Amino acid sequence: MAPAVSLAVLALVALLAPGLGVALPGCDYPAHLWCSSWEIAVACQVESHCANLLRPAAPPVELTLFYESLCPACRWFLVQQLFTTWLLLPAEALSITLVPYGNAEERNVSGKWQFQCQHGPEECLGNMIETCLMHEAKNFSSYFPVIFCLESGSSVTKNLEACLQVYAPQLDSGRIAACVQGDTGAALMHHNAQLTQALDPPHQYVPWVVINGKHTDELQEQAQASLLGLICRLYQGEKPEACGASGAPKAPFHCRH
């Protein structure tokens, strides 16, 4: 028995090729296959009539934030823009990578990496805590609320236990501390240094925002003015409901070298 053809497709055949049953120009498929896949529907220009097909999922917008834990501008952007945007958008619309290092410098002393940070040793410790937290938690949705808690609180370096209790009680603070104090943390921070040093163009300040592998002054300004609006414009899939919201005020400064 021949495959069933939808009434919509039959109507299209009647309208577009009356009496012939031939395909549209550029479409090499018979009418009964026009709604068999999204690719064929697009080729035959009938996708709006193939209600049974789902549009292929658009890739998420890829955002990488290069920052440092005690930079006021970084904290503002992470708390006021990035975290709120992440809460509002579904995972399929936005994928985030965090790289805490920023304007730090590193040197290898007798085979061990040492770090000097723009806002002093406390910032190096904060960078290391957040890096080890990410390493131990693995899952972004587990560690990002903890980082938000640290960055929005009174002390990035002293509130880990409290933030874990609220946002990720399943994580072991002892393992995070061991990472911070051991070779693993230094190796992870060295990797962050390599990622930061490999930026093209080189970063001039933090927060430094890379969108889909690209950084421009225009993207940076748009991200700091309204990150939600920027992601909504760039996302090629069906727009989430939150994309009707307005943006937050623009961050007034950076932390430069």
Model-based region annotation:
Residues 45-61:
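A short beta-strand-turn-helix
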Residues 59-173, 238, 245-254:
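Structural alpha/beta surface segment adjacent to cysteine/selenocysteine redox centers
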Residues 2-5, 12-37:
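N-terminal signal peptide
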